[in-house]
Amino acid sequence: MCGIVGYIGYQDVKEILLRGLEKLEYRGYDSAGIAVLNESGVHVFKEKGRIADLRRIVDPNVNATVGIGHTRWATHGAPSRVNAHPHQSASGRFTLVHNGVIENYEMVKRDYLADVAFQSDTDTEVIVQLVEKFVRDGLTTEEAFRKTLSLLKGSYAIAMIDAQDENTIYAAKNKSPLLVGLGDGFNVVASDAMAMLQVTNQFVELMDGELVIVTSENVTIQTLNGETVKRKPFTAELDASDIEKGTYPHYMLKEIDEQPFVIRRIIQKYQDDNGELAIDKAIINEVLNADRLYIVACGTSYHAGLVGKQLIESWAKIPVEVHIASEFSYNMPLLSEKPLFIFISQSGETADSRAVLVQTNKLGYKAITITNVPGSTLSREADYTLLLHAGPEIAVASTKAYTAQIAVLAILAAAAAKAKGFELDFDLTKELAIVANVMEMLCDAKEEMEKIASDYLTLTRNCFFIGRAVDYYVCLEGALKLKEISYIQAEGFAGGELKHGTIALIEDGTPVIALATQEHVNLSIRGNVKEVVARGANPCVISMRGLEGDGDRFIIPAVHPDLTPLVSVVPLQLIAYYAALHRGCDVDKPRNLAKSVTVE
């Protein structure tokens, strides 16, 4: 949930670190800091708040060519300057940044560091104080670093500098992402390649239980046992322009607008030599061999999984269960005889999902990861990967990854159906192309969406979304988008469930957004709208062309009924965006949230 960077080379390091941290703010932005090392010692700058707040306190007169940085999402200790990283050892010799959670930090603190006066409330400070203790006991820095790592339980990505050695960064990884970037006369470490695209596109992945000794000329990867590891670098297939806002005021709006292009790219990427949509035969064989599919995901990805379940069961006639990853880990259901797991994660680093994958791997079950990030932890540890090809998603609130996940699940469902002899009565390629065109039209309806947000949501404290069948799943996502960026208490409900309790919350003026895109439940959902209107609600009905009724606020051009979630979500994304904007909220970086949730 935090982001770390490090640089060692020949350039002044401050701006490289700050720009790198700006690219990692999606991982957390409670506080931030950098530490740079030169002949006069270590200079630490840290501040509560955003990278912009940190920039204001960095001394421009301090020059150095080695340094580390961190942007934080608090897990241990409140957001504050004291708890911000980097943390230093008691003497100030060692300075360290850390992403992850040290589960046994209290035990380590008690058993090894009882005589140390700690400066913060974080688990991270235990690491740097322990390194110094072992150096005082006579170990070299590398030996002390290695011994410290051997005592830690939990997740970590660490970068550390030694005030007595301007030529080295020490780094390590376990269950939290960390890459080493390679350059000519310099090397870097980072949680994400995006952070260091400014200086290199060549990276080496670290695996769990590995540490790395980084100098300006060499990178030495080792196991905790001291064995040297050789690993080929990869080229990050990102352009720096992909992670810039360009002319957009916010990343979220840019990413909403990118959705039509993402759908078209997915069509292109998943076409075989005959121009037909297809999935790798090995994956389809696994799907056919399974007696039940288990989709495991969190948040927006979980909502995409619910739509995927509908498509797979309807088209391929394969039973599917969808589970919240954080619950599955601690309450595994009774599994079928031949389960196949599908993990959905935009980042491929979601800790809750990875915890389930570790369990299922131990049990010997096959797994597929659907992710936007090739080479991510979930991608590496699953048997198969289906890529989203959505491009970098920077805004914390997911938009284009959600629709990409549904599109890929649709292609998987269609391929499995075809392999089982269930031919679809429509051309999925053509229908997805229509979806992309309709998405484009919806993205052009920003003024109408802004007006809806203004009319219904500017002053409200709560909002309800209602739908039936697959519309209900989209309502869950619409409510999540609204609550996470506008801070309006929003909930999505199945229309028929209102009368079983929720309708008690309806009062004069309560906004209720209803989706009506499914013909077989159209009359039912409109009956539910009448129920809330009778209790004083202020209804906003968004319907599909051909199913519209009198008074509907917005009508979506028609697409195939099974693919409506791909388009009906776009108005909800835009409504949430403008509601947040009107309320003065930080659209891209909502409070208390982080994009890549790498702690359980």
Swiss-Prot record:
GO terms for cellular component: cytosol. Residues 283-422, 452-590 form the SIS domain. Residues 2-217 form the Glutamine amidotransferase type-2 domain. It is an enzyme of class 2 (transferase). GO terms for biological process: carbohydrate metabolic process; fructose 6-phosphate metabolic process; protein N-linked glycosylation; UDP-N-acetylglucosamine metabolic process. The keyword Repeat applies. The active site is at residues 2, 595. SUPFAM superfamilies: N-terminal nucleophile aminohydrolases (Ntn hydrolases) (SSF56235), SIS domain (SSF53697). Signal peptide: none annotated. GO terms for molecular function: carbohydrate derivative binding; glutamine-fructose-6-phosphate transaminase (isomerizing) activity. The keyword Transferase applies. Keywords: Aminotransferase, Cytoplasm, Glutamine amidotransferase, Repeat, Transferase. Transmembrane segments: none annotated. Its EC number is 2.6.1.16. InterPro entries: GATase_2_dom (IPR017932), GFAT (IPR005855), GFAT_N (IPR047084), GlmS/AgaS_SIS (IPR035466), GlmS/FrlB_SIS (IPR035490), Ntn_hydrolases_N (IPR029055), SIS_dom (IPR001347), SIS_dom_sf (IPR046348). It is found in: Cytoplasm. It catalyses: D-fructose 6-phosphate + L-glutamine = D-glucosamine 6-phosphate + L-glutamate. Gene3D superfamilies: Glucose-6-phosphate isomerase like protein, domain 1 (3.40.50.10490), Glutamine Phosphoribosylpyrophosphate, subunit 1, domain 1 (3.60.20.10). Homodimer. Catalyzes the first step in hexosamine metabolism, converting fructose-6P into glucosamine-6P using glutamine as a nitrogen source. HAMAP family: GlmS. This is Glutamine--fructose-6-phosphate aminotransferase [isomerizing].
